[in-house]
Design a protein with these regions (language model features):
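Feature for soluble, non-membrane regions of globular proteins
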Residues: 1-204
Length: 204
């Protein structure tokens, strides 16, 4: 069973003006597809092509670096499309909102900490909000296509991701050029907090 490109849950232009249609078209149809093609090549003839991608990543230290890079790329982008929405809200509600306030002091303080992690990630990578094994919310950034599920990230950064932001240049350069902070600020307008809340509940 080969891995395949998931369909976007919205049109390429649906996130404008925050994320432009051309970026979405290239990011989803070209970059994400390339990770899938390379992942399928890396797992061909092994038992990995029958495993869920999350299960592979939890033990990714056992596999070739191509599985880490391209498996991470596939998982991360599939995750990213799901936590974006044209109907982005002002912020989280319910238990996830309470957990964010309890951990970070306020939603605004959380946004500042998350945005700082995304802004200061040197080179390519991701910023994450994740549920640690003690059920506490934490923020980290990871290089390349790593994520908190992987057993190759530092122990203190391991857990279940519930919100992520791609800060590779291909995610924003067409529209924002070198203005990464503007892209990060725009991201908050298209976060699907209902999806984040659902993933939070699943991670507990």
């Amino acid at each position: 069973m080969a891995f395949s490109l998931p369909k976007l849950p919205y049109a390429h232009h649906a996130l404008e003006p925050h994320i432009d249609a051309m970026t979405m078209e290239l990011h989803h149809g070209k970059h994400h597809q390339a990770y899938i093609n390379n992942l399928n090549q890396a797992v061909a003839g092994t038992d990995l092509d029958n495993k869920p991608i999350a299960a592979i990543l939890k033990n990714v230290s056992q596999y070739d670096v191509a599985v880490r890079n391209n498996g991470g790329g596939h998982y991360n982008h599939t995750f990213f499309w799901a936590i974006l929405s044209p109907q982005g809200s002002d912020g989280p509600l319910g238990e996830i909102a309470d957990a964010i306030r309890q951990r970070f002091g306020s939603f605004e303080q959380f946004k500042e900490a998350f945005s700082a992690a995304a802004t200061t990630r040197f080179g390519s990578g991701w910023a994450w909000l994740y549920v640690a094994k003690n059920s506490e919310l934490n923020i980290c950034s990871t290089p390349n296509q790593d994520n908190p599920l992987m057993d190759v990230v530092p122990t203190e950064h391991r857990g279940t991701p519930i919100l992520g932001l791609d800060v590779w240049e291909h995610a924003y350069y067409l529209h924002y050029q070198n203005r990464r902070p503007e892209y990060i600020a725009a991201f908050w307008n298209v976060v699907n907090w209902k999806e984040v809340a659902k993933r939070f509940q699943q991670a507990l």
